[in-house]
Amino acid sequence: MEIINQTIALMDETAAVKALSALAQAQRLRAFRALVAAGSDGLTPGVISEQLGVTPSALSFHLKELSHSGLVNAEARGRNLIYRASFDHMTALLGYLTAHCCQGQACEASSLAQCLDC
């Protein structure tokens, strides 16, 4: 429980708004979901562009927005960039939303493991 509380503490209102704003656009949400599905292997921009049917220049803009929000990390691997979802940031955002969703009263949050279609 302490680890969860520490993760939630990493998220404040400003960071939550930034992350939610980044996800409040269809192409960025699709790109983020593709990166979540890819897991720790991540994806190159070319693969994401092909999967989503988005031009490379448009995707570059969207990945930059996701990176600035903290939801996505990029790593140079040779001549390629590998993008990965930041699961720590995503968990902190979900924890922040859950912790503040019931106006200070206990609320029942279902397990994330139950969200198989996400």
Model region roles, listed by residue range:
Residues 63-64:
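Short, hydrophobic-biased segments on the C-terminal half of alpha helices
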Residues 75-76, 107:
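Conserved catalytic-core motifs of GNAT/GCN5-like acyltransferases
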Residues 10, 14-55, 77-89:
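N-terminal helix-turn-helix DNA-binding core of bacterial DNA-binding proteins
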Residues 50, 67-68:
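Alpha-helical residues within the helix-turn-helix
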Residues 1-15, 36, 87-118:
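Amphipathic alpha-helical dimerization/coiled-coil segments
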